[in-house]
């Protein structure tokens, strides 16, 4: 699963995109026409903050709209979805 956080449209400089600018409450990633996951945006952001050793990668580097983001492997997605470490903090 790739989570985009920046893009460089037409080489105009890197700007926040994707997860960093969404106003949605849920982040949906479609694996295939019959398979997808939905995760609360704040949970995904907490996951990336806590797991800050995950390196940001550049995708479509040579296109006119390259992006940067995080490649989450299946074991990462499993932790994101199942660990209470990423639950909304309670007061």
Predicted regions, residues:
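Domain-level recognition of nuclease-like catalytic cores that cleave nucleotide substrates
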Residues: 27-65
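Charged phosphate-binding loop/patch that engages nucleotide di/tri-phosphates or the phosphate backbone
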Residues: 55-91
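Catalytic cores of nucleic-acid endonucleases
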Residues: 1-37, 41
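Compositionally biased amphipathic helical and low-complexity segments enriched in hydrophobic
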Residues: 20, 29, 49, 72-73, ...
